[in-house]
Design a protein with these regions (language model features):
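Substrate-binding/active-site groove segments that recognize
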Residues: 212-238, 246-256, 340
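Extracytoplasmic small-molecule ligand-binding "clamshell" domains
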Residues: 26-120
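Export/targeting segments at the very N-terminus of extracytoplasmic proteins
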Residues: 37-38, 158-209, 247, 262-264, ...
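Extended ligand-binding regions for polar small-molecule ligands
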Residues: 21-41, 47-48, 76-88, 127-160, ...
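C-terminal motif of bacterial Sec signal peptides marking the signal peptidase cleavage site
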Residues: 16-19
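Low-complexity, Gly/Ser/Thr/Pro-rich intrinsically disordered linker/tail segments
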Residues: 332-376
């Protein structure tokens, strides 16, 4: 038995399908050029086996062309193409992310994956030893596919990301009313020792105070809680459109993030990191902190870390060995923190008759255990 691979040009990705077989050589002509083909006389795991197992395994690296997570939704041109291909086969797609192309080649050579995808300059290739699967892929592919997939992704990233009604950022400044939900902000902000107006500012950034808001990724309600996050928090998905339940869930999650960043002693700075993590994910923010620390910056100061959040969109940074969670669209996260802080500054002039709940000065923490400590 020997391992042989076929290369198929797709325009900006390298797709590789691998298996073990004995070969005979054949030249094939496809819309994207001449292909050197190898047809197996035996094949250890091919199209029929994949359809029987119900799973197509894709191995890739993190990156904007390959595969990344954005607000709970997985994107990347290669991933979306492979997802469509898996759908056409009637199977689910499982994605395995590795550090570099050498690891991908190793997994391919060992027959552990069905498709390997990684970016190559200016074109997409595919190599395969699974002849049936390769022919299925060739017959399924059409020249307009990449453009269609890229348009789909760009539409998701550029159109309004949250379907929502736009409400005023402040209902009645003179009357001390920011929103219809101020009573809930006041009640629950105390649990995380936040000024309630900061929670209101974050809510406006998330949903513009629309309790029926829903994002393209499926986040719901005032504070845009993902269904999976609701499960983690023990909140019924059916209650995510209920204002109080949604705010309560968000506060519980914020409390967990505060615990995650308890190594940041300054409360104001820690809150910046919590806000950034609520938007972009705590793992990515930790990656940016590690990059900042490596470059002799203060990893506990947001102004030092924010530039590295932006840099996680650049290959030389998201491929750095110190980075564990890969590519990130950091510009939105940096903007998210800035906008909330600016809106909160505007809200701080709001007076309310409920004077007991809105002090902007954090209360002194007691020594009891944080109710939102994560379990190991």
């Amino acid at each position: 038995m020997q391992k042989w691979y076929k290369y198929v040009g797709f325009g900006a990705i390298l797709l590789s399908l691998a298996s073990c077989f004995e070969k005979k050589h054949e030249v094939m002509v496809a819309p994207w050029g001449v292909i050197e083909d190898t047809i197996p006389t035996t094949d250890e795991f091919d199209l029929h086996d994949i359809q029987t197992s119900g799973e197509l395994i894709m191995a890739t690296v993190s990156g904007p062309q390959t595969y990344y997570e954005y607000h709970g939704k997985y994107l990347g041109t290669q991933f979306l193409i492979c997802q469509r291909f898996a759908d056409s086969l009637g199977v689910r797609l499982r994605v395995e992310v590795y550090r570099d192309s050498l690891e991908l080649v190793k997994r391919q050579a060992e027959g552990e994956v069905d498709i390997v995808a990684w970016p190559t300059p200016g074109h997409i290739d595919a190599d395969t030893a699974k002849n049936d699967l390769a022919k299925e892929l060739q017959g399924w592919y059409h020249p307009g596919l990449i453009a269609a997939v890229q348009k789909e992704e760009n539409d998701l990233l550029t159109v309004r990301k949250v379907s929502r009604r736009i409400f005023s950022p402040m209902l009645d400044a003179k009357g001390g009313v920011i929103s219809h939900y101020d009573q809930f902000f006041m009640a629950y902000a105390r649990d995380i020792r936040w000024d309630w107006r900061l929670l209101a500012a974050q809510c406006y950034q998330e949903s513009t105070f629309d309790p029926r808001a829903v994002s393209f990724a499926g986040a719901k309600g005032l504070m845009q809680i993902m269904p999976g996050t609701a499960d983690h928090l023990g909140v019924s998905r059916s209650k995510l459109y209920e204002p109080e339940a949604n705010i309560q869930a968000a506060v519980k999650y914020i409390g967990q993030l505060q615990n995650t960043f308890k190594d940041i002693r300054d409360n104001y700075e820690r809150t910046n990191f919590v806000l950034a993590s609520y938007n972009g994910g705590a793992h990515h923010i930790r990656d940016a902190m590690n990059l900042a620390k490596r470059d002799a910056k203060n990893p506990h100061r947001w102004s030092d870390v924010a530039p590295y959040v932006l840099k996680l969109a650049q290959p030389q940074y998201y491929n750095d060995p110190i980075v564990k969670y890969g590519y990130m669209r950091g510009s939105e996260t940096v903007d998210y923190v800035q906008r909330i802080r600016q809106r909160h500054a505007g809200y701080q002039g709001v007076k309310t008759k409920f004077m007991g709940f809105h002090s902007s000065k954090p209360r002194k923490a007691d020594k009891r255990k944080n109710k939102y400590d994560l379990k190991d």
